[in-house]
């Protein structure tokens, strides 16, 4: 009888990536298979997020539910990972002593050993250290699940925005070696992946070491990934404006694989609030970067993050944010009411904006951006869009579903042989959350760029044997 694993994940795409790696790791090392039902599991893992308000209380509420399962199944192993685990450490076990394992984002690769030690009766295991990039050296080979895949290229953030917990929960910026990143993507491409999403808390700050002692910038990485045959779309998240440099903008001029969509968080349209947030850029600098980007890629759409009701935010500050939104014409946003995060500098500031004022500001901001999004959608009516076909439509299994470059969902009729590839579709209807289209052509009629076969990249990796530093030699041609 196989052992069962249940993972509950909250938070960002990095957490989703980490959870998939936990599943692969425990399958490869211990033979655990995933189950959607926690009642069936031998191991329960909660991968947490500390971004939202009352994150800790949400964790203990979930653990309380699992406590009942453990009462009926004493051998059940319960583990807590992610950013709340990194923040709280052994304090989690103080409040929930039935938790067996507490691990941080950088120590998930040690899970097989920690689970084994618990099962051997060696007591609870707590490891929330920051061993830099070690976890990537210990993970199993990547497995593709469809035409899109996420690849983590770096961890942590060194910007220390006053409201943000990431530097304290995931550590400072550490980039994966270039050849490791390219090798993972080449493996995924050989398995049929067509779109890769590069992940990092501050992804465009990537500075990956190369085999010859050099450093690969994010702009250089984008071009190298684009050269891998089969990878015809590149996304990345999340970017920081201060790291969105001219060399990255130049990539948009000559690298069509990088999609015409960018998520670039600004947080506020007020320089005064940005200073209080310790964001090292001004509104003018942000607008300048967007202007130059649109000159390089005129059809690009932009999304962003906004925090409303930051301490001491006045009506004038908020109106400055609304002015920026109107000037940039954002396609979408992740927008939140400010709430203090324990341990951050902003938590020491008086939370002096009335909650009703915060709610009203958020409602107005979201209403404007939703209207902008609908206008952008309507402008796509009658246009031909290249769709990466992901599978049958959830609305109608007889139809297909895919995404445009600017991340719009499109449903259309077409042969199921298109799944996993690209299709050109004429947009015939615009709906609030999706588009409808008419199939025009498959990728056999397209002139997709071919540069470097994945097998060539894999062959350059010398028998998968790392050097003493754990970095294999990759020589880009």
From Swiss-Prot:
Catalytic activity field: N(6)-dimethylallyladenosine(37) in tRNA + (sulfur carrier)-SH + AH2 + 2 S-adenosyl-L-methionine = 2-methylsulfanyl-N(6)-dimethylallyladenosine(37) in tRNA + (sulfur carrier)-H + 5'-deoxyadenosine + L-methionine + A + S-adenosyl-L-homocysteine + 2 H(+)
Domain Radical SAM core: 143-375
TRAM domain mapped to chain residues: 378-441
Names of required cofactors: [4Fe-4S] cluster
Residues binding [4Fe-4S] cluster 1, per UniProt: 12, 49, 83
Protein family according to the UniProt entry: Belongs to the methylthiotransferase family. MiaB subfamily.
Protein name stated in the entry: tRNA-2-methylthio-N(6)-dimethylallyladenosine synthase
Species for this entry: Aeromonas hydrophila subsp. hydrophila (strain ATCC 7966 / DSM 30187 / BCRC 13018 / CCUG 14551 / JCM 1027 / KCTC 2358 / NCIMB 9240 / NCTC 8049)
């Amino acid at each position: 009888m196989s052992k069962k694993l249940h993972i509950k994940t909250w938070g960002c795409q990095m957490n989703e990536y980490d959870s998939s790696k936990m599943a692969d790791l425990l399958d490869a090392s211990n033979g655990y298979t995933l189950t959607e039902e926690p009642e069936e599991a031998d191991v329960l893992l909660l991968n947490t997020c500390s971004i939202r308000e009352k994150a800790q209380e949400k964790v203990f509420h979930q653990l309380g539910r699992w406590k009942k399962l453990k009462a009926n199944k004493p051998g059940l192993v319960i583990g807590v990972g992610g950013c709340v685990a990194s923040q709280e450490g052994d304090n989690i076990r103080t409040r929930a002593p039935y938790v067996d394992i507490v691990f941080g984002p950088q120590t998930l690769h040690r899970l097989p050993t920690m689970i084994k030690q618990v099962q051997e009766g060696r007591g609870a295991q707590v490891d929330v250290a920051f061993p830099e990039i070690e976890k990537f050296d210990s993970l199993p080979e990547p497995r593709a699940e469809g035409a899109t895949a996420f690849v983590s290229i770096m961890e942590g953030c060194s910007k220390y925005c006053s409201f943000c917990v990431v530097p304290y929960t995931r550590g400072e910026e550490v980039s994966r070696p270039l050849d490791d990143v390219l090798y993972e993507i080449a493996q995924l491409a050989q398995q049929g992946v067509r779109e890769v999403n590069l992940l990092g808390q501050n992804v465009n700050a990537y500075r990956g070491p190369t085999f010859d002692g050099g450093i690969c910038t994010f702009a250089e990485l984008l071009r190298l990934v684009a050269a891998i045959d089969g990878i015809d779309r590149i996304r990345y998240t999340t970017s920081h404006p201060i790291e969105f440099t001219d060399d990255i903008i130049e990539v948009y001029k000559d690298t069509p694989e990088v999609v015409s969509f960018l998520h670039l968080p600004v947080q506020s349209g007020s320089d005064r609030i940005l200073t209080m947030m310790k964001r090292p850029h001004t509104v003018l600098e942000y607008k300048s970067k967007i202007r130059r980007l649109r000159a390089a890629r005129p059809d690009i759409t932009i999304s962003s993050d906004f925090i409303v009701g930051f301490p001491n935010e006045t009506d004038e500050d908020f109106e400055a944010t609304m002015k920026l939104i109107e000037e940039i014409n954002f396609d979408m946003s992740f927008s939140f009411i400010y709430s203090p995060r324990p341990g951050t500098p902003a938590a020491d500031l008086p939370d002096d904006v009335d909650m009703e004022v915060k709610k009203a500001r958020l409602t107005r901001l979201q209403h404007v951006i939703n209207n902008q999004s609908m206008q952008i959608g309507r402008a796509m009516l009658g246009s031909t869009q290249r769709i990466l076909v992901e599978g049958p439509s959830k609305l109608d299994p007889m139809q297909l579903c895919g995404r445009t470059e600017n991340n719009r969902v499109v449903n259309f009729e077409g042969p199921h042989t298109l799944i996993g590839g690209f299709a050109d579709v004429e947009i015939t209807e615009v709906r609030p959350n999706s588009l409808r289209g008419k199939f025009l052509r498959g990728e056999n009629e397209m002139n997709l760029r071919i540069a470097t076969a994945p097998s060539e990249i894999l062959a350059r990796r010398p028998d998968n044997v790392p050097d003493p530093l754990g970095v294999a030699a990759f020589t880009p041609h």
